[in-house]
Amino acid sequence: VSSDSMEDIIDYQLTPSIHDLHQLNHFTNILVSLGIKNYPIHIKLNTGMNRLGFDKNEINDLCDYLLAQPEIKVEGIFSHLAASEIVEGKDLTKKQINSFQELSTLMESKLSIDTTKHILNTSGIENYSDHEMDMVRLGIGLYVGSKKPYNSTVASLITRIAKIRNIKKGDHLGYGLDRIKKNMKIAIIPIGYADGFKRNFGNGVGKVYIKDSFYKTVGNICMDMSFIDISNTDLNVGDRVEIFGKNNDINKVAKSINTIAYELISSISNRVVGVYLKD
């Protein structure tokens, strides 16, 4: 994390997660330069995912460092589960939870503090609710349940029909030399792989929802445009097209191209305009 980013964290009074001594030392030096003391942080522990976080053999050095730094206040300790959504991952998840409880208790004892502890992600909340501790981290669960249907949809990806064409059998459509195998009525929608509507959805793999019905893609997904087969309908330019949302479940959409909802949501590009609705 750059110095500018860390200063932004301080300016906006955010709480950083710290995962190694280099990062901690860098952040502490900035606090010293600004004359700030008791700034709250959350410490991340590596309990088995082996991505970010302090390892067990680093805890003593970490605690020694923290005891010598009045600029830092350890407000929370957390870790991240690697396989909480997988039935076969139960042993690993339990091992991670036990390791986290051991290491966080050790830290609290050495530092003589009481912290906010958290390890459960969305799947962890669903499958290991007896380990909620002091807080949980509902990430993808804000948008979709990882397994269970939720009562409301927080996010939808919406576009509208930009143009309608009647294409004859044998005509070309979009990029490539493939020809249409039958007469079709085609809706062109202004969304493509540059927006996050992946090329894998092309040629009938993807389905969109328009006015109470599902319609398949046809042809290749372009960078900025896609084609939908709307034959035998009375749809019009401007009609609302749901890529995923209340009527087109994102888990099913993701499964159709052998991926997960996380990837679809995180793939939506910055050029897609976000509209925030308040109930």
What is the predicted function of each stretch?
Residues V1-D4, D20-N25, K94-D279:
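Active-site anion/phosphate-binding pocket segments in diverse small-molecule metabolic enzymes
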